[in-house]
């Protein structure tokens, strides 16, 4: 199990790279994260949801994403509450305190999923969440040491030297852990080093001396990480590309921002995620309103930031606007939530750029989907993950044929479009045509680029980590009889 000294130390990337490295060694590998918190969900073939990081790790391992790879997914809806997804299915919304009390039942689900994976594969790479040093969260924990103890697995602790203080991170974690948890950690590694590795030899040795743990490597910064699907939206914002400018307002409950990954990978495209407090730039080729875990709440947030004024001005200047899922709903005339599916019951006015109306009702739709463009008959693959149904005159100008039905809406001037289909930009031919309509060319093979980068990441870890030492730490897991 790979645990970190904090959030965003690179655990997900390490698991993806190690999964590809071990697969290249001929091992059957599966990724596993008992509990994840993310609104960036992936859809599995059976209509379940898991964290998108685990979907990338599954790809690295040569597997289709499966709900057992992330049995508990928390999708924040407010600062103190989240939708709880258990083994792919929505179990309801829980306040933080209620979730803490319900963890005992969730541990059973995580162990059940883990044991299924362990029975099917040579090795399971487990990713922790946050840090085991959060001692106030240890009771009832299912994300780090609580799971490691219940499953009987050894732990590799990873620190991040990029943010500074990595010696204190690792030694401090050693200090605050209970002796039984400390004993589970068998080794440490340092991630995201920049510069001459030999300069940290003394620091590495000091950590080993103070903790008694051996080092499995000091891993240099992997410069091509931006070519892989991002787990954090700011990883996308940090990469600047070409002249085609795609501007994205950073919604408070932004969801499924993986829609931006293929655009960010385009040499001709710069994706700019605009944080709160800043106006949307006036020189955008496209304003893309992304998905949201709280559409009505994020529409109010968008207005509070003044972005509604910026979007309408962009459209008046002749600019293009695309709304996906929640963003599509925001572009319409109104959103009606009679049952309080998205929050408090009520009806709100939309941005009015599409002549459509949304009603938040019915079952949640979670499915992988295959479509074709109505203009040009180009193949488009993606997924749907939404509540609500959208209808209205602009739906008569749908732009996708999705499994026998028309999907999406287009404004009368052709410059505003919306759809419930996430992931459509991973389809190279569609993305190239979309960018061509904006006046920019593309010949990028997105999937080939992701595969090549995973191979490069695996080689990077083989060079700088003691992968043999990691394999020696692995222990057989007794799988309970069903």
Swiss-Prot record:
Organism of provenance: Ruegeria sp. (strain TM1040)
Annotated disulfide bonds: none
Family to which the UniProt record says this protein belongs: Belongs to the CobB/CobQ family. CobQ subfamily.
Domain of life: Bacteria
MF term (GO), any: catalytic activity
Listed name of the protein: Cobyric acid synthase
GO BP term (any one): cobalamin biosynthetic process
Protein purpose: Catalyzes amidations at positions B, D, E, and G on adenosylcobyrinic A,C-diamide. NH(2) groups are provided by glutamine, and one molecule of ATP is hydrogenolyzed for each amidation.
Keywords: Cobalamin biosynthesis, Glutamine amidotransferase
Residue intervals of the GATase cobBQ-type domain: 243-430
Associated pathway: Cofactor biosynthesis; adenosylcobalamin biosynthesis
Keyword Manganese: no
Active site: 325, 422
Gene from which the chain derives: cobQ
């Amino acid at each position: 199990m790979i645990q970190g000294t904090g959030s965003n130390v690179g655990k997900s990337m390490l698991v993806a790279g190690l999964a590809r490295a071990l697969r290249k060694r001929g091992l059957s590998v599966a990724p596993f994260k008992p509990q994840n918190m993310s609104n960036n969900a992936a859809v599995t073939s059976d209509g379940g949801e898991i964290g998108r990081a685990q979907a990338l790790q599954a790809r690295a391992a040569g597997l289709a994403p499966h709900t057992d790879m992330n049995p508990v997914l928390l999708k924040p809806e407010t600062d103190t509450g989240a939708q709880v997804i258990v083994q792919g299915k929505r179990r309801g919304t829980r306040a933080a305190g209620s979730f803490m009390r319900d963890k005992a039942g969730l541990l059973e689900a995580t162990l059940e999923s883990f044991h299924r994976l362990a029975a099917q594969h040579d090795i399971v790479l487990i990713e922790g969440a946050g840090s085991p040093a959060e001692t106030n969260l240890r009771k009832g924990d299912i994300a780090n040491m609580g799971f490691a103890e219940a499953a009987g697995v050894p732990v590799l602790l990873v620190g991040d030297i990029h943010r500074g203080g990595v010696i204190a991170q690792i030694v401090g974690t050693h200090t605050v852990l209970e002796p039984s948890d400390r004993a589970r950690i068998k080794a440490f590694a340092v991630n995201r080093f920049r510069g001459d590795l030999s300069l940290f030899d003394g620091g590495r040795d000091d950590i080993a001396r103070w903790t008694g743990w051996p080092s499995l490597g000091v891993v240099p910064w992997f410069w091509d990480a931006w070519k892989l699907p991002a787990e954090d939206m700011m990883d996308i914002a940090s990469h600047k590309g070409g002249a085609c400018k795609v501007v994205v307002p950073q919604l408070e409950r932004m969801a499924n921002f993986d829609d931006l990954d293929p655009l960010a990978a385009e040499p001709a495209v710069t994706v700019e995620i605009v944080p709160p407090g800043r106006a949307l730039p006036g020189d955008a080729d496209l304003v893309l309103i992304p998905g949201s875990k709280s559409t009505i709440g994020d529409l109010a947030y968008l207005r509070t930031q003044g972005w509604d004024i910026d979007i309408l001005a962009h459209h008046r200047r002749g600019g293009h606007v695309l709304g996906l899922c929640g963003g599509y709903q925001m572009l319409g005339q109104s959103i009606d939530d009679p049952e309080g599916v998205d929050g408090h019951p009520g009806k709100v006015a939309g941005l009015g750029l599409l002549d459509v109306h949304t009603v938040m009702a019915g079952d949640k739709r979670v499915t992988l989907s295959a479509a074709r463009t109505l203009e040009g008959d180009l193949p488009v693959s993606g997924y749907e993950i939404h509540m609500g149904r959208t209808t209205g005159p602009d739906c008569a100008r749908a732009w996708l044929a999705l499994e026998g039905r028309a999907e999406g809406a287009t404004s009368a001037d052709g410059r505003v479009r919306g759809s419930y289909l996430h992931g459509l930009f991973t389809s190279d031919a569609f993305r190239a045509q979309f960018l061509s309509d904006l006046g920019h060319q593309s010949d990028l093979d997105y999937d080939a680029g992701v595969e090549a980068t995973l191979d490069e990441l695996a080689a990077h870890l083989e060079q700088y980590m003691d992968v043999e030492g990691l394999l020696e730490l692995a222990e057989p897991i007794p799988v309970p009889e069903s």
